[in-house]
């Protein structure tokens, strides 16, 4: 699936405010849709939370935007620039002596509740994340550039 944009609406994405914009995430179809004034502006494939790490269903709004966000939970332990323990959940895996935690990159992060947000990441075609909504990088940037703090986000089954 590719991200589609309605050309005649493209310029509307750059205007300030949240009026008329919303993001709808469909967990069933594994896609995110960006609307403006009720019309589809863009559609992108996603990867939502895998079993046991479910993406929360509900009505939210964008509460933080961070173009170069890093996870505060998932990542690697690094010592002297070298990874000494990879793919850790720092709440569960003790930090090796002399190492520091380096969170996994989450570019174009749009937080919508707690520890959950939309961001660029691997999209294998099925739910595979730790709960966030991953989009291909170019689509994540498009959504990031189009929305503002306060933009509604609906996550539905």
Across the structure, where does each feature detected by a protein language model lie?
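C-terminal motif of bacterial Sec signal peptides marking the signal peptidase cleavage site
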Residues: 1-2
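Exported/periplasmic cell-wall-interacting domains
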Residues: 5, 16-18, 57, 76-157
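N-terminal post-signal-peptidase region of extra-cytosolic proteins
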Residues: 9-22, 27, 42-52, 57-60, ...
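Soluble periplasmic/extracytoplasmic beta-strand elements of cell-envelope proteins
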Residues: 22-26, 31-35, 45, 61-63, ...
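Solvent-exposed coil/turn segments that connect beta secondary-structure elements
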Residues: 28-30, 37-40, 49-51, 65-68, ...
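A short, polar/proline- and glycine-enriched secondary-structure boundary/capping micro-motif
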Residues: 36, 44-45, 53-55, 73, ...
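Short amphipathic alpha-helical segments with coiled-coil-like heptad repeat character
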Residues: 40-43, 149
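Short, solvent-exposed cationic patches
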Residues: 60-72
């Amino acid at each position: 699936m590719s991200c589609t944009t309605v050309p005649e609406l493209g310029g509307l994405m750059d205007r300030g405010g949240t009026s008329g914009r919303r993001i709808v995430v469909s967990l069933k179809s594994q896609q995110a849709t960006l609307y403006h004034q009720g019309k589809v502006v863009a559609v992108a494939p996603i990867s939502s939370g895998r079993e046991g790490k479910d993406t929360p269903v509900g009505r939210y709004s964008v509460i933080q935007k961070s173009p170069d966000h890093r996870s505060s939970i998932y990542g690697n332990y690094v010592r002297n620039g070298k990874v000494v323990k990879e793919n850790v959940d720092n709440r569960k895996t003790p930090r090796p002596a002399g190492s520091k935690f380096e969170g996994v990159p989450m570019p174009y992060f749009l937080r919508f509740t707690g520890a959950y947000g939309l961001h660029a990441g691997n999209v294998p075609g099925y739910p595979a994340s730790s709960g966030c909504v991953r989009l291909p990088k170019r689509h994540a940037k498009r959504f990031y550039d189009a929305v503002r703090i306060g933009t509604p986000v609906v996550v539905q089954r």
